[in-house]
Amino acid sequence: MTKNIRKVSNIRYASIREMDISNGEGVGVALFVQGCPFNPHCYNCFNPDTWDFNSGKEWTPEIKDKFLELIDRPYIKRVSILGGEPLASENLDGVLDLVTEINKRYNFQKVDSANPCKIRVSEDKNTDKIRLLSSHKNIWLYTGYKLIIDYSESKRQRKTVFTLLPYANTNVVNDINEYRMLCENDDKRRMIAESVDFIVDGRYIDSQRDISLKWRGSSNQRVISVQESLKQGKVITLE
C-alpha cells in the first residue's frame, strides 16, 4: 500500500513574519520568498539575504499549512508576499498555488474547473454576507516588475490585460537574453497579478528613497489597487 504524499511547488522562503504591520495596510502575515533574478540587485536592498535561490528554507506542505493557520486568526486582515522576487520564474508555481489557496479559503472564491488558474467569485446565494466582509484577507504582492495595463474596448469585447515588465525602461537592458529570461512565464505572472488585491511595483531606487512613504521604500514605487484597476482599465493607486 502506497502512502499519498502531498507536494507543493519547489520554492524556498527566507522568513515568515507572523505579525506584520509595515508591508501593507492593517495587521497581517508576511512571507518573504527566496531568490531574486535581477542583475544588478537594487543598491542598498533591504533584504540581500533573499537574493540566492538556493539559500533559505524549503517551502514544504507542513510549512504551508502552518502559514495558512497564521492567516486564519480573525484579527489578521492581510497577507503580504515579498522577497526576494515573488514573480521570478522559479517562484511562480508556488506563489500561484498559495494565492489560489488563500482566495479559496478566505475570500469566498472558487477555482474555475475549466481553468484551474483562473479564480472567479462564488455565486453561492447562501453565503453569509456579514461573514464575507469580516473574513476577507487582502493579498499584497511586492515585486520589482513594473505593472502596465493594456485596455481595449469594442462592441464585442471589453478587456483589461496586465503586463509585467522587468525594467521600467528597456534602454537599461544590457543583455537581451537576460531580459527574455526575466519575461518567461508571463501568463502565470499575469494570473498571480490579477488574483491579488494590491501590488507594490517597481524596483527599489536608493536615490529616490523616501521614509515618509507608506508601504514602500522609494518614490518610483506605486501601491496599486488591482481589482479597481481591472474595473477601470487603468492603473489606480492608493496614493
Briefly describe each language-model feature range.
Residues 75-102, 211, 220:
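Conserved glycine-rich "GG(E/T)P / GGGxP" loop and the immediately following alpha-helix
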Residues 52-53, 85-90, 174:
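Short, small-residue-enriched loops and turns at beta-alpha junctions
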Residues 50, 84, 204:
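Flexible loop residues that form catalytic
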Residues 60-64, 93-99, 182-187:
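Charged helix-capping and loop-helix junction motifs
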